[in-house]
Amino acid sequence: MIALEKDEKLLILNWLRNLLARELSDEQLQTLQAVEFSQFFAFLAEIGFEKQSSALQQEIQKIALFQHPRLELAADFTQCFLLEGKVSALPYASAYLDGQSLKQNLAKMDRYLEHFQLQINRQTNEPSDHLVVYLEVLIKLLEQNKTTEAKEFIQQQLLTWFPQFAAKTEKTNIRTNFYPILVKLLFAVLQNF
């Protein structure tokens, strides 16, 4: 695993955040399928994420064979992340933590949101314990060159519940492996920070 520079970490985290935030648009899917995007996959492989990069490329090729690839991915996004917790891998800390550990995690997240003056998106009405909000805080820490704090944030805020979330994405009943592969890639990035 190659040690990543700040800009490389930000590039990967922003990319993953955008892909995990909501259903893919036609434009996002076309970009992923474009030949030019293979350079990004090569970059991921070069820095130590070869397994995840290769799996993602293969999955994108499989998705292209569907009659309506974006609709298949939209259905998978819903099934994977938006239904109730018995069938979906809910991307919320509160789905995996409870009691005092949840209370402490959420209190610390609220302090981060206040510190960075981040507002919860009122259009999507996402709670502060959504994975994408955690990624936004992590990105802010990196942007402000707070590398040590970013590593602590990963250990104390994300990895306390993310492994259970990642495992659950693998068990969802979906037609493609696109989202589980993205989550595996994010997990690998977080572990190798």
UniProtKB/Swiss-Prot annotation:
Subcellular location(s): the record lists:
Cytoplasm
Q: What is its main location?
A: cytoplasm
Keywords attached to this Swiss-Prot or TrEMBL record, sorted alphabetically, are: Chaperone, Cytoplasm
Q: Which domain of life is it from?
A: Bacteria
* Entry-linked Gene3D superfamilies: 1.20.120.1820, HscB, C-terminal domain
Pfam families noted in UniProt: Nitrate_red_del
Instruction: Cite a single GO BP annotation.
Output: protein complex oligomerization
Q: Cellular component terms, GO, for this chain's entry? A: cytoplasm
What family name appears in the similarity comment? Belongs to the TorD/DmsD family. TorD subfamily.
Q: Which NCBIfam families match?
A: PRK04976.1
Any idea what job this protein has?
Answer: Involved in the biogenesis of TorA. Acts on TorA before the insertion of the molybdenum cofactor and, as a result, probably favors a conformation of the apoenzyme that is competent for acquiring the cofactor.
Q: What name does the UniProt record give this protein?
A: Chaperone protein TorD
* Gene source species: Actinobacillus succinogenes (strain ATCC 55618 / DSM 22257 / CCUG 43843 / 130Z)
